[in-house]
Amino acid sequence: MAISKEEVLEYIGSLSVLELAELVKMFEEKFGVSATPTVVAGAAVAGGAAAESEEKTEFNVILADSGAEKIKVIKVVREITGLGLKEAKDATEKTPHVLKEGVNKEEAETIKKKLEEVGAKVEVK
């Protein structure tokens, strides 16, 4: 039985950010492509300042290390991401791991503070 394009889109739409990031990695590995956008040299010169300001408005929160108190970190990861217990545990064990993508600076700093309070090491990029 063939799967329709609509069913694929429906399934992808139901994935969490974490699951979607893993799916993108799988596509990159299987097809030998990169999901990073390419920049045309002429456009980079003309819009370089605009691109820099856009990049600074959205941040990714990366769990670099879960530290010694993993249970507390798992609880905070679940609170932040809405993941289930197993998914949150997997996220804390497979570091570095992107927890949130495209968040504003204030939210990224709040998430970082919560995780660091329970002993995790966090990067905001």
Curated annotation (Swiss-Prot):
Assigned keywords, A-Z: Ribonucleoprotein, Ribosomal protein
Listed GO MF terms: mRNA binding; structural constituent of ribosome
InterPro entries with a match to the protein in the record: Ribosomal_bL12 (IPR000206), Ribosomal_bL12_C (IPR013823), Ribosomal_bL12_C/ClpS-like (IPR014719), Ribosomal_bL12_oligo (IPR008932), Ribosomal_bL12_oligo_N_sf (IPR036235)
ATP-binding keyword on record: no
One term under GO cellular component: cytosolic large ribosomal subunit
Record flagged with keyword Ribonucleoprotein: yes
Function text: Forms part of the ribosomal stalk which helps the ribosome interact with GTP-bound translation factors. Is thus essential for accurate translation.
Similarity section: Belongs to the bacterial ribosomal protein bL12 family.
Assembly behavior: Homodimer. Part of the ribosomal stalk of the 50S ribosomal subunit. Forms a multimeric L10(L12)X complex, where L10 forms an elongated spine to which 2 to 4 L12 dimers bind in a sequential fashion. Binds GTP-bound translation factors.
PANTHER family: 39S RIBOSOMAL PROTEIN L12, LARGE RIBOSOMAL SUBUNIT PROTEIN BL12M
Protein name: Large ribosomal subunit protein bL12
Organism: Helicobacter pylori (strain G27)
Species classification: Bacteria, Pseudomonadati, Campylobacterota, Epsilonproteobacteria, Campylobacterales
